[in-house]
UniProtKB/Swiss-Prot annotation:
Family: Belongs to the pantothenate synthetase family.
Intracellular or extracellular location(s): Cytoplasm
Its EC number(s): 6.3.2.1
Name of the protein in its database record: Pantothenate synthetase
Primary location group: cytoplasm
One Pfam family hit: Pantoate_ligase
Keyword Nucleotide-binding tagged: yes
Annotated positions binding (R)-pantoate: Q57, Q150
Anything else known: The reaction proceeds by a bi uni uni bi ping pong mechanism.
GO molecular function list: ATP binding; pantoate-beta-alanine ligase activity
InterPro entries the record matches: Cyt_trans-like (IPR004821), Pantoate_ligase (IPR003721), Pantoate_ligase_C (IPR042176), Rossmann-like_a/b/a_fold (IPR014729)
Sites where the protein binds ATP: 26-33, 144-147, 173, 181-184
Organism: Burkholderia cenocepacia (strain ATCC BAA-245 / DSM 16553 / LMG 16656 / NCTC 13227 / J2315 / CF5610)
Alphabetical list of NCBIfam families matching this protein: cyt_tran_rel, panC
Length: 279
């Protein structure tokens, strides 16, 4: 596996490749990330991964400086997955001058849920993903469903900007107790780690209620919010939305069996966790 930091060297290395499968990450890789590499291999060859902690998608009170950086360990994991190239640029490589141009998602998708609680987050994501796509020029890129809203925004962005890349969605990987794998799980204290699976269990109960015929979605959302708060969580949102556009479904759409997803974000101690389940 070649480890490359220069954009020009990356382009030279990939010149002539027309089936490249790309997996962008911020590093601190776990089994969830590695499952993306394996899925990428099913859709293209060679597989290219990137590791770049993107300052543009962190807010002023977020954890950019303490975000775990474990490059050597990540390299060893990617070598075991037979990744062809790891693109690991420095901040100077990616942003040699102030990034004055940004890719802004529409407010109807980028300003809700995560976008409401993390202003500027999706503009940072869209900008860096567009730049990475320009560097790698993949045929396929793999994104996890755990970041459901991000997946939808990136997919729509590629469609509307006519980027010639297929976005493949990967299922969320979970620990045995149901907690979705995340680099931020390492911030949890032992007691918080024991409590953390309750987020997924709460979403499962919401899903079961909807599938069981409950149609008062607002009541389900409020009950879930209250349940988590009573256990010491600080929920940002619990929302049942249409999978197609993350808009709340109408009564007619519910009766017609519109595909739904329940999404949540909540703080447990100092750690903010997100999760979702398709319904």
């Amino acid at each position: 596996m070649k480890v490359i930091s220069s954009i020009q060297e990356l382009r030279d290395q990939l010149r002539g490749q027309n089936r490249t499968a790309f997996v962008p990450t911020m590093g601190n890789l776990h089994e969830g990330h590695l499952s993306l590499m394996r899925l990428a291999r099913q859709h293209g060859d060679p597989v290219v991964a990137s590791i770049f902690v993107n300052r543009l998608q962190f807010g002023p009170n977020e954890d950019f400086d303490k975000y775990p950086r474990t490059l050597q360990d990540d390299i060893e994991k990617l070598q075991q997955e037979n990744v062809y190239v790891l693109f690991a640029p420095t901040e100077r490589d990616m942003y040699p001058e102030p990034q004055e141009y940004r890719v802004l998602p529409p407010d109807d998708l980028g300003g809700i849920l995560e976008g409401e609680f993390r202003p500027g987050f999706f503009a940072g994501v869209c900008t860096v993903v567009t730049k990475l796509m320009s560097c790698v020029q993949p045929r396929v890129a793999v994104f996890g469903k755990k970041d459901y809203q991000q997946l939808m925004i990136v997919r729509r962005m590629c469609q509307q900007l006519a980027l010639p890349v297929e976005i493949v969605a990967a299922e969320t990987v979970r620990d045995e107790d149901g907690l979705a794998l995340s680099s931020r799980n390492r911030y949890l204290t032992p007691d918080e780690r024991r409590e953390a699976p309750e987020l997924a269990k709460t979403l499962q109960r919401v899903r079961d209620s909807v599938l069981g015929g409950e149609r008062d979605l607002g009541k389900l959302e409020q009950h879930a919010h209250t349940h988590l708060a009573e256990r010491g969580w600080v929920p940002d949102y619990i929302a049942i939305r249409r999978r197609a556009n993350l808009i709340a479904p109408s009564a007619a759409e519910l009766e017609a069996g519109e595909p739904l997803v329940v999404l949540a974000a909540a703080k447990l101690g100092a750690t903010r966790l997100i999760d979702n389940l398709e319904i």
